[in-house]
Amino acid sequence: MDILLILTILIVICALAFDFINGFHDTANAIATSVSTKALKPRHAIILAAVMNFVGAMTFTGVAKTITKDIVDPYTLENGSVVILAALLAAIAWNLITWYYGIPSSSSHAIIGAIAGAAIAAAGFAALNYKGFIKIIEALILSPIIAFVLGFILYSIVKLIFKDSNLAKTNKQFRRVQIVTAALQSYTHGTNDAQKAMGIITMALITANLHTSANDIPTWVQFACATAMGLGTSIGGWKIIKTVGGKIMKIRPVNGVSADLTGAAIIFGATFIHLPVSTTHVISSSILGVGASHRVKGVNWGTAKRMLITWVITLPISATLGAIAYFILNMIF
């Protein structure tokens, strides 16, 4: 069998594995608030998230097109198949490490950093599509900041509207609303996160001359990635649910709805303009913004600091892992 075909098959398998892991690693963030407030039972939340992630993944492909062509040029990438496989293995390794320790790291940072690191190892810094790459990095940096500010503002407005309401009654009403916002957040998660694997597989198909257009995501790729993420979601990432849903702040239904709406708005906005963002950090930052508006001292800033450190180090670490994986695979293939 042709070595290029073997590499492409391995890439498809690893990309679907990445999406599967992304499902149980990142989807915890989308349902963490609804589980922590008991708006949904854990198993019901997981099923809801799995279905909505699948639906979201089947709805859009704009982010996939960005991943396909804006980090590196798939048509000219030197030793492209090895680069892509190395990036996937590096991102999967980092995701599993952070999942094991219950750290809400970003699959987006991991795969984007790993692709950049592997491409630089293969062909130097000239391999990067700087215009597209910088645009992606800007989105990754700005989106959690915007989420924090928007979460703070939205919850401040909610507090003002319900300042004279009975707290217990208000939370009971918001608990019902939170089922809807959890579904919405899971849907938007699927519209952005599942597309990263779609873009990677399409990039690999172009590199192997099995596909021609970076602006056309094959239907089978979209369906396979949506299914992988849905299945991964069905397993659930309980360690990360505990961190996002309880260790940042004590979340009440009114807090959860505000955070869910903020996160969903930012993620869907990014999807609409075809930009990949870290759903992990957007959702976590939304909760931090809501928490700061509710009561600054009520936020566990130690957990927030640990998440911030992970946010900062994921790109360089995944880039380094991508480069190391490339050098190893290049000796094999």
Curated annotation (Swiss-Prot):
Keywords: Cell membrane, Membrane, Phosphate transport, Symport, Transmembrane, Transmembrane helix, Transport. InterPro entries: Phos_transporter. It comes from the Bacteria. One of its GO terms (biological process) is phosphate ion transmembrane transport. GO terms for molecular function: phosphate transmembrane transporter activity; symporter activity. It catalyses: phosphate(in) + H(+)(in) = phosphate(out) + H(+)(out). It is found in: Cell membrane. It holds the Pfam family PHO4. The chain crosses the membrane at residues 1-21, 44-64, 83-103, 110-130, 136-156, 217-237, 263-283, 308-328. Its main location: membrane. GO terms for cellular component: plasma membrane. Belongs to the inorganic phosphate transporter (PiT) (TC 2.A.20) family. Pit subfamily. This is Probable low-affinity inorganic phosphate transporter.
